[in-house]
Amino acid sequence: MKKVLVVGSNGKEGSLIVNELVSRGYDVTGLGQSENKTNVKQYIQKSVFDLIKEEVAKYDVVVDALGAWTIETIPNIGNAIIYLGKLLSGTNTRLVVVGGAGSLFVNDEQTVTVDMGPDFPDDWKPLSSSHGKGLTFLKQTSNLNWTYISPACNFVSDGVRTGSYKLGFENLILNSQGESTISYADYAIAFVDEIDNNKYNKQRISVVSK
């Protein structure tokens, strides 16, 4: 049974990933700064930045599902990816990250990203930048097993769980309706499928509804 640590397990997406992992028989430990709000019995109440290498290296997979929505905490998104990446460098533990959509490319030359577009809200740019900082670090780190999973642009917290999705890579992809959208529930399925399969090591992938 694989052991998985889920950082940000109390969050909306983190808790769905926890549930999906538990349903598939993983040995799951949650981590957050507040009291445990999930259905896992193993829980670490502390900041991600207080973790040490010996703690995280004993897991097969570390999930980074940390959320942040205030201007003060948004930098923690990228900083947490970097911090965990440094802790896990040189180990066999995989780091799988709940990513952002803003850094997905929208042209074949891969020179223009979603967050460079005129319709991308200014309020979202700090969050996208923080995610991008973390992704850049991952791509530049050779001795780390990682996968960064970008959701669609429209990431629907209360969306329907359909059980189906479509995968892409560095470029923005659309569903059969020409939309970039996915529910939190379907994203969690795709996320844990990648933990199951370990198919896209050292890559960014993206996911959209069918």
Q: Which positions does each model-derived feature cover?
A:
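N-terminal Rossmann NAD(P)H-binding glycine-rich loop of SDR-like oxidoreductase domains
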Residues: 4-24
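Conserved beta-strand positions in the Rossmann-like core of class I SAM-dependent methyltransferases
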Residues: 5, 29, 147
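N-terminal Rossmann-fold cofactor-binding loop
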Residues: 31-35
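Glycine-/Pro-rich loop/turn segments that contact NAD(P) or position catalytic residues
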Residues: 72-160
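Substrate-positioning beta->alpha
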Residues: 130, 178-192, 203
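Glycine/proline-rich active-site loop of Rossmann-fold NAD(P)-dependent oxidoreductases
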Residues: 141-143, 156-164, 194-203
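A conserved pocket-lining segment of Rossmann-fold NAD(P)-dependent short-chain dehydrogenase/reductase
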Residues: 166-182
